[in-house]
Amino acid sequence: MDQDYERRLLRQIVIQNENTMPRVTEMRRTLTPASSPVSSPSKHGDRFIPSRAGANWSVNFHRINENEKSPSQNRKAKDATSDNGKDGLAYSALLKNELLGAGIEKVQDPQTEDRRLQPSTPEKKGLFTYSLSTKRSSPDDGNDVSPYSLSPVSNKSQKLLRSPRKPTRKISKIPFKVLDAPELQDDFYLNLVDWSSLNVLSVGLGTCVYLWSACTSQVTRLCDLSVEGDSVTSVGWSERGNLVAVGTHKGFVQIWDAAAGKKLSMLEGHTARVGALAWNAEQLSSGSRDRMILQRDIRTPPLQSERRLQGHRQEVCGLKWSTDHQLLASGGNDNKLLVWNHSSLSPVQQYTEHLAAVKAIAWSPHQHGLLASGGGTADRCIRFWNTLTGQPLQCIDTGSQVCNLAWSKHANELVSTHGYSQNQILVWKYPSLTQVAKLTGHSYRVLYLAMSPDGEAIVTGAGDETLRFWNVFSKTRSTKVKWESVSVLNLFTRIR
């Protein structure tokens, strides 16, 4: 607000108060008995008009509005994916420029805007100060309007209105490919879909394992366990993408060479079905209904380098190694999430906040030690943990059974698949936990999830016997020009 205009406004208010004071005094005299010893003021007002010229308007504006909305409304307000949300942010920034002199030249992300407005340290100055500001605006500030300008707004607002709009991110709600998957089991505790680093998808259908090449769309049958009287309960690719592990209902783990279609070994040790597999270089971890986790090196003879991890009281249904290959997270039907390391046979961390089976587990590739987990039907929550300190971070109720979790390789986002009762796929932004997209199409629980090696597409499987491919994430392509590379002083950009 202009200081001269503010002074004139305050002067008018003071004059009006002084003009109305005699009337108030006369009314008090008529209502007060003559014998009353209390006398009313007759010359001085009873109000102090504060001068807000020295106040921090941005901080005051944030403090006034920070408690107006509920947390759910704040979460919806932060979701700026729609055009109406972006228009509202631009309009709010324009009002701040004209009324508060904020000097905003481009529309910021709502989360960034909240952090910018919120002071990092407590303000020592009061909200109302009774002194005039000594700061004077200089012509270089860009807030003064040119005398030749016909625009009713300031220069900063003009730059704000001329700033290009950030392109809206579009996530298709229709899968770009749908494949039939007959006999795909509708079992929450199994893991029957995995995508290799060589762009080959493995799917366990009944007693067989099929391989589908995303490059050629060719389908091959890797193995058939009907001869052995067994069925497939889990599949998992090695990091190199040349080996695939197959867990069976009888408790065996078979190692297959995908290119040659040859079984290399069969690992024993479990007494019940193997529903979870996790590779760590040449080591393979398997979780079973017998409540046991076995770690084995496939390069050594069977049972020679076996490690038995006992910590769950019911079936182990989720296994994931951290991105640095140092920690193993396991989830079970006992509602527990356990974290293991290489040197101990007992869990180094134990989380019991979930109220249902923990199958969905995912380690963040962007933040060291950040672990996400999801609970079953009775829990419906996605929880985040700092495994470096052992402390819980955040929690969000999704409203339905959490079946799978996967982090994006290119952005700080994650995707979750759900069962009862929504049967949907959700994309979340972290750490704000705002929904980026909601995908529907499966008629049964979305029990299976795998991500493509380039990190842009995902495949989901459900009991409706279909595999659906979605384009969810995209690689960030920088379009900024580095001025040092085109500088005249840079000799490497010129012909010598």
Swiss-Prot record:
Consequence when changing residue 47 to A: Inhibits APC/FZR1 E3 ubiquitin-protein ligase complex activity
Organism: Homo sapiens
Encoding gene per record: FZR1
Protein purpose: Substrate-specific adapter for the anaphase promoting complex/cyclosome (APC/C) E3 ubiquitin-protein ligase complex. Associates with the APC/C in late mitosis, in replacement of CDC20, and activates the APC/C during anaphase and telophase. The APC/C remains active in degrading substrates to ensure that positive regulators of the cell cycle do not accumulate prematurely. At the G1/S transition FZR1 is phosphorylated, leading to its dissociation from the APC/C.
GO molecular function, one term: anaphase-promoting complex binding
Start-end of Basic and acidic residues biased regions: 76-86, 106-126
Protein name: Fizzy-related protein homolog
Superkingdom of this protein's organism: Eukaryota
N6-acetyllysine sites (modified residues): 69, 159
GO cellular component terms, A-Z: anaphase-promoting complex; cytosol; nuclear membrane; nucleoplasm; nucleus
Pfam family name, one: WD40_CDC20-Fz
PANTHER family xrefs: CELL DIVISION CYCLE 20 CDC20 FIZZY -RELATED, FIZZY-RELATED PROTEIN HOMOLOG
Biased composition (Polar residues): 32-42, 146-160
Keywords, comma-separated and alphabetical: Acetylation, Cell cycle, Cell division, Cytoplasm, Disease variant, DNA damage, DNA repair, Epilepsy, Intellectual disability, Mitosis, Nucleus, Phosphoprotein, Repeat, Ubl conjugation, Ubl conjugation pathway, WD repeat
Signal peptide bounds: none
Gene3D superfamilies the record matches: YVTN repeat-like/Quinoprotein amine dehydrogenase
Region described as Involved in APC/FZR1 E3 ubiquitin-protein ligase complex activity: spans on this chain: 47-52
Region (Disordered): 28-51, 64-88, 105-166
Keyword Cytoplasm included in the entry's annotation: yes
Annotated positions of the Phosphoserine modification: 36, 133, 138, 146, 151
A GO BP entry: regulation of meiotic nuclear division
UniProt pathway: Protein modification; protein ubiquitination
Start and stop residues of the WD repeats: 182-222, 227-266, 269-306, 311-350, 353-395, 397-438, 441-480
Free-text tissue specificity from the UniProt record: Isoform 2 is expressed at high levels in heart, liver, spleen and some cancer cell lines whereas isoform 3 is expressed only at low levels in these tissues.
Chain positions with Phosphothreonine modification: 32
Family, as annotated: Belongs to the WD repeat CDC20/Fizzy family.
